[in-house]
Amino acid sequence: MAGLFYFCRMEISTDVKNILGLQLPSDPRWVNLARLKLEEILTDHAYCEQKAATTCISLITKNPEKELLVDELSPIVTEEWGHFRMVVAELKKRKLQLGKQRKDEYVNNLLQFQKKDGSPMERFLDQMLIMALIEARSCERFKRLSEGLDDAYLRNFYRKFMESEAGHYTLFITLAEHYLDKKIVRKRWAEWLTYEKKLMKEMELRGDRIH
């Protein structure tokens, strides 16, 4: 997995790992629906990786003075784009088509909770926590796919992605705590987890999307 699945070089404490708990697991029926829509799931997954890469580029260009952030996110950009290519290759191998990118209801709803009138550092914190949350939910969904798909190759394929996303979401929390007080980060993270739980309850269950 070296070279394909990057794990952050920063030391991530057990304390950080322990706070990263989604409050609501995915509905078990989701993976059953996803089995029936592999082309749509792989297409959506490819665009999730593309958006992750471009968002990391945006974070770097908006925060060039944050040296540690630049150092840690630069390899993530390369990795996420590599993931995009891997998923597209999987589509081609199966003689499936990369469809058009669709509106991401999950992410758009997360953005509604982002502080619009806070200080620059408050807005930065929310950007980091949104990324952490997206990676955490992706990790959870990839775990579902790695356990619930009929295709053994795809189960292993998604297990590798699950391991990668686990390293990513802890990285965003660790970076946030590097630049802001840990108590502030933990408090806001708890608020985000509560909001995401509510969001997951309200969203329509769909098998054609990763989120």
Language-model features, listed with the residues they occupy:
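N-terminal amphipathic/basic-hydrophobic helices that include classical n-h-c signal peptides
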Residues: 1-9
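Non-heme di-metal
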Residues: 10-211
